[in-house]
């Protein structure tokens, strides 16, 4: 194994406290050397909470605060990757506050990444959705031992996000029926551009992708952990709509905003949590499996936090305080990176259009050529049929005399 290998975690969070405390600690205890946090305009207890968490982890935890900039996730991620200054010996693991890595007992992602060859620039892993209880309290650590239900997604679903959103809103499809896309861990050492959500490595395009077996490494994802978090997501969806993001960007949160606007969010929660009274309206329920792997994986993290000087009960009393920019130039830097991204995406889109138009023109010419060949073949068939007909043979002398008279 490469002794100089480092694994650096990166999480972008907005109003994610106290869950963020748990996910950062879980990553630092088990899998990564450092965690960088981009606190994006949080207005809850995130700022004070991160300061207290930094007292525990010291230099292993770095915080960048950003305020007043739209949620340009790809540009923000690229900025932090530049600040990290990762080398080719480093791997970047981008995770969300509601994601927790699961490995077989006693193993770390470090061992797996250490065996990945130099030709691989990214490592792909699977993400499974977990289902929460109807009255879940994120501040009560004892309740995490109840999270044993893993959603069984229907992998035959491959529909556009707008159709998925409409079907879920109507209740004909359950949110947990939809598979969550796999994600990638990427190698450092150069300009890196990750898609939103870290589902795809856009740059560099060179290099192969290594795929991890889910038995060795997967992530437990809690998209709907509590009713309080559900309302936060709906509020974030409203922000995305107001800022003019397309419907596919954060489509889940935009869908929750629409459900909230029509008074259907409470019924949605009943159909997507365990132990709630029956939903008020028709709707499908998720397929589930009893799985203790998350409970087993999170137990050491809960024990560690229980032994720290900062008691988790303080999470209830942290005052909401907007997080200002850590760096004066952070907003400008992200704006500049975003502009570069827009230009790059526009160039790529134009190239795609040109290729598509060329392909369409080639297809059109091939179709026209096919029609002409078919017409020529039909004409030749008719000519041969006429030449072999009895009337044609009987009138051959007459045609010969006619040619002589000319």
Which stretches of residues belong to each language-model region?
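Catalytic-site signature of metal-activated, phosphate-bearing donor transferases
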Residues: 74-76, 103-321, 328
């Amino acid at each position: 194994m490469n002794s100089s290998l480092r694994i650096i975690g990166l999480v972008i969070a907005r109003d994610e406290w106290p869950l963020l405390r748990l996910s950062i600690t879980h990553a630092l205890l088990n899998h990564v050397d450092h965690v960088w946090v981009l606190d994006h305009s949080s207005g809850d207890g995130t700022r004070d909470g991160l300061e207290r968490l930094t007292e525990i982890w010291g230099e292993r935890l770095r915080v960048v605060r950003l305020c007043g900039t739209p949620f340009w996730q790809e540009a923000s991620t690229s900025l932090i990757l530049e600040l990290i200054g990762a080398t080719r010996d480093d791997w970047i693991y981008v995770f969300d506050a509601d994601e927790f890595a699961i490995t077989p007992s006693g193993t770390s992602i470090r061992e797996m990444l250490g065996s990945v060859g130099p030709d691989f620039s990214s490592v792909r892993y699977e993400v499974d959705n977990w289902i929460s209880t109807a009255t879940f309290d994120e501040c009560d650590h004892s309740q995490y031992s109840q999270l044993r239900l893993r959603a069984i997604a229907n992998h035959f679903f491959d529909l556009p996000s707008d159709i998925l959103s409409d079907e879920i809103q109507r209740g004909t499809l359950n949110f947990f029926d939809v598979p969550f896309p796999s994600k990638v861990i990427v190698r450092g050492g150069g300009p890196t551009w990750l898609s939103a959500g870290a589902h795809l490595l856009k740059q560099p395009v060179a290099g192969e992708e290594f795929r991890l077996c889910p038995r060795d490494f997967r992530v437990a994802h809690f998209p709907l952990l509590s009713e309080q978090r559900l309302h936060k997501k709906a509020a974030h969806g409203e922000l995305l709509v107001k800022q003019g993001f397309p419907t596919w960007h954060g489509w889940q949160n935009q869908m929750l905003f629409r459900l909230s606007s029509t008074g259907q969010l409470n019924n949605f929660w009943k159909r997507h949590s365990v132990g709630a009274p029956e939903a008020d309206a028709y709707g499908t329920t998720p397929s589930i499996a009893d799985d203790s792997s998350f409970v087993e994986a999170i137990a050491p993290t809960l024990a560690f936090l229980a032994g720290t000087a900062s008691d988790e009960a303080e999470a209830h009393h942290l005052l909401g305080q907007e997080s200002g920019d850590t760096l004066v130039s952070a907003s400008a830097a992200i704006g500049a990176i975003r502009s570069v991204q827009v230009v790059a995406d526009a160039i790529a889109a134009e190239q795609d259009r040109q290729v598509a138009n060329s392909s369409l023109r080639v297809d059109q010419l091939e179709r026209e050529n096919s029609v002409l060949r078919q017409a020529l073949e039909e004409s030749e068939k008719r000519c041969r049929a006429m030449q072999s007909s009895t009337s044609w043979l009987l009138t051959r002398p007459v045609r010969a005399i006619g040619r002589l008279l000319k």
